[in-house]
Design a protein with these regions (language model features):
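A short core secondary-structure module
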Residues: 1-22
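Short amphipathic alpha-helices in soluble, non-transmembrane regions
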Residues: 2, 11, 108-117
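An extended, acidic, His-containing surface patch that forms the Zn2+-binding/catalytic region
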Residues: 6, 21-83, 90, 107-111, ...
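C-terminal catalytic subdomain
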Residues: 10, 88-109
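A common structural junction motif
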Residues: 15-19, 114-122
Length: 182
């Protein structure tokens, strides 16, 4: 008999080992600038082939933050399957927490999940429970100019850079209505 729990275990293994495509965009470059990343470290963090391992290697020195700011995260957190000890499960439900970066939509997420799952993708139903894509506000605004001026008044050598908060804030509720949120 086809044991869905065994298949789910393989899906989980593949999700856990998947490395989503890094997003090394203008926000990423600005973050590296703001952090003063230079030389070999910057080169490694700008290399799509090395950014994952470099961020992980930094560990508590900001590695987790750098990793989350450069990659969509995939975290399978809840698994439910089987009813009784003497029944082979025919279905398993896996809840996966996915944190996207700005510009990564549902189609992008689905493509990454299918790439991770590989040849099992046609045997898996992907259901989107929440579609709250990451958002960002433009920083070429009068409000951004005021923020920069205030920071420079306090410290003329300070660098002001749009940040990326991984996780969630209330900004996701206001931006769709046209609000600029920093």
């Amino acid at each position: 008999a086809d044991n869905a729990l065994l298949k789910a275990a393989e899906v989980l293994r593949r999700l856990g080992g998947h490395r989503p495509t890094p997003q090394l965009d203008d926000l990423w470059i600005g973050l590296l600038d703001a952090l003063g990343m230079e030389g070999d470290m910057r080169a490694a963090l700008m290399d799509p082939e090395r950014v994952w391992d470099t961020a992980v290697a930094l560990g508590d020195l900001g590695g987790k933050m750098l990793h989350a700011c450069s990659h969509m995260s995939i975290s399978p957190n809840i698994v439910q399957g089987g009813q009784k000890i003497n029944m082979i499960p025919d279905a398993v439900h896996i809840d996966v927490d996915i944190r996207t970066l700005p510009g990564q939509d549902t189609d992008y997420v689905r493509a990454e999940l299918e790439a991770a799952i590989g040849d099992l993708a046609d045997q898996v139903d992907i259901e989107v429970l929440s579609d709250r894509s990451a958002s960002r506000s433009p920083h070429e605004t009068p409000m951004w100019g005021v923020i920069e001026s205030a920071v420079k008044a306090a410290d003329p050598t300070a660098r002001v850079h749009p940040g990326l908060i991984v996780g969630g804030t209330d900004a996701r509720y206001y931006r769709p209505h046209g609000a600029t949120v920093y």
